[in-house]
Curated annotation (Swiss-Prot):
S-adenosyl-L-methionine binds at A34, G35, H36, D51, F75, D96, H103. This is Ribosomal RNA small subunit methyltransferase H. Specifically methylates the N4 position of cytidine in position 1402 (C1402) of 16S rRNA. One of its GO terms (molecular function) is rRNA (cytosine-N4-)-methyltransferase activity. It is found in: Cytoplasm. Disulfide bonds: none annotated. HAMAP family: 16SrRNA_methyltr_H. GO terms for cellular component: cytoplasm.
Length: 285
């Protein structure tokens, strides 16, 4: 196994808003490298950690952290996973929606446009891969996917380039796709030209926005009175879903404006730059 290098984003802010109390039961719905989970444990809480990635689950179990129960599964099935443990109510729920550093740093998972690997992008290693999507989706559907899930202004041009390329030979790797996009749109000042294309494909492959909506609805249900929900989003589509849900959920919103990383944290951890943290509390009846 590779060494643990994942850096939790907005670590202190998330734990402070979660208001961990000794003996309380908390859900880390995106366990990953267990960074946030460790913080909850250090404050005396018990943690149920969910992750759909079997590799992340194996890493977390290998830590043998007292008070941590590790469950493999998608957070969209939160209530089901808690019921299997005999848990009806929890004192807090944390979700860090960012792509794990483990995923980005492992070329074999296919998340990075900067490292060559198979076009996969599946968080849970089940279902269709990004390779299947880019090689099979019709032009119009592909353009719509890039426009709606990647907020890509040149979606149609990129989709046309992908279709033209796959007519010659299947698109197999991350760098192959990234080069197709680069040639289609050229270089950009704001990041790599393939960034939004890769975001769109990842969201589509993992059905991320629907999963997030289902998770949020269930999270509000299983929170105990005065229990808190803390969510860290990393792009505007996610943040929009979280913001709308909190506004309509009946929960007491604790963050009038989302918390964002300090300049120091953003400099130390560039992947944190786009993070936005929102939190809410379930009021006592």
């Amino acid at each position: 196994m590779r060494p643990m290098t994942h850096v939790p984003v907005l670590y202190q802010e998330a734990l402070d808003l979660l208001a961990v109390r000794p003996g309380g039961v908390y859900v880390d719905a995106t366990l990953g490298g267990a960074g946030h989970a460790r913080g909850i444990l250090e404050r005396g809480g018990r943690v149920i950690g969910l992750d759909q990635d079997p590799e992340a689950v194996a890493r977390a179990k290998g830590l043998h952290l007292p008070g941590l129960t590790v469950v493999q599964g998608n957070f969209r099935h939160l209530k089901r996973h808690l019921a299997a443990l005999g848990v009806e109510r929890v004192d807090g729920i944390l979700a860090d929606l960012g792509v794990s550093s483990f995923h980005l740093d492992d070329p074999s998972r296919g998340f990075s446009y900067q490292k060559e690997g198979p076009l996969d992008m599946r968080m849970g290693l089940e279902g269709p891969t990004a390779k299947e999507v880019v090689n099979r989706l019709p032009l119009e559907a592909l353009a719509r996917l890039l426009r709606e899930l990647g907020e890509e202004p040149q979606a149609y041009r990129i989709a046309r380039a992908i279709v033209a390329a796959r007519e010659k030979a299947p698109i197999e790797t991350t760098t192959q796709l990234a080069e197709i996009v680069r040639k289609a749109v050229g270089f950009r000042r704001a990041g790599h030209p393939a960034r939004k294309t890769f975001q769109a494909l990842r969201i589509y492959v993992n059905d991320e926005l629907n999963a997030l909506k289902e998770f949020l609805e269930q999270a509000a249900e299983v929170l105990a009175p005065r229990g808190r929900l803390v969510v860290i989003a990393f792009h505007s589509l996610e943040d929009r879903v979280v913001k709308r849900f909190l506004r309509e959920s009946g929960l007491k919103v604790l963050t009038k404006k989302p918390l964002v990383p300090s300049e120091k944290e953003a400099a130390q951890n560039p992947r944190a730059r786009s993070a936005k943290l929102r939190a809410a509390e379930k009021e006592a009846p």
